A protein has these predicted regions:
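Secondary-structure boundary elements
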Residues: 18-77, 139
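Hydrophobic/aromatic-rich core segments of domains that either
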Residues: 40, 85-145
C-alpha cells in the first residue's frame, strides 16, 4: 500500500481542504482505567499491550456517522464508531500507556501509526523522519497487526 499524500495529525484541529478534522484524544481517568484493564495480564509486554488494545477497538462495530469524532468514552458507551471514532479511542489508549502514536489522514480514511522502539516486526510500516511506524487499522476485524 502506497500513500502519495497523507497528514500526520498532531493538533486538536487540522484543516484539510474545505474541512477541519477534530482530534478527540483523551488522557483522562476513564481512558487510563480502561487501558490498564485491557493490559493487566500483559506483564509490560509491549506487543501484548498494543494487540490487546487494538483487539478491543476492532471488536467495536464499525458504523459510519456524519458527526465529528466522538470521545473514547462515548465510543465505548454507544458500542459503535467509524474510522475516526475508533482511531481516537485507540490512540487515547496508547497515549495513556505512553506509546508514541499518531493519526494518519488519507483521502476518506484515518488510521493510527505507532513507533515500537527496539521492536522489529515483519509488518508493513510508514517511515517518518527515518523512524519506523507500524500501521494499526481500527476498522479491521480479527487481524493480528
Amino acid at each position: 500500500m502506497i500513500y502519495s499524500s497523507f497528514f500526520i495529525v498532531k493538533n486538536q484541529f487540522t484543516d484539510i481542504g474545505d474541512s477541519t478534522y477534530v482530534n478527540q484524544v483523551r488522557v483522562d481517568d476513564y481512558t487510563k482505567k480502561l487501558a490498564d484493564f485491557l493490559t493487566k495480564n500483559c506483564k509490560q509486554d509491549t506487543i501484548c499491550e498494543v494487540q490487546n488494545m487494538l483487539d478491543f477497538v476492532t471488536q467495536i462495530p464499525y458504523k459510519i456517522n456524519e458527526s465529528i469524532a466522538k470521545s473514547p468514552k462515548k465510543v465505548v458507551e454507544q458500542n459503535f464508531g467509524d474510522c475516526d471514532d475508533k482511531s481516537n479511542l485507540l490512540i487515547s489508549l496508547l497515549k495513556v500507556k505512553d506509546y508514541e502514536a499518531y493519526f494518519v489522514l488519507v483521502p476518506n480514511h484515518i488510521f493510527v501509526i505507532i513507533n515500537l522502539e527496539g521492536i522489529n516486526l515483519n509488518k508493513k510500516a510508514l517511515y517518518v523522519n527515518n523512524k519506523k511506524y507500524y500501521i494499526l487499522e481500527t476498522t479491521a476485524t480479527k487481524k493480528k497487526q
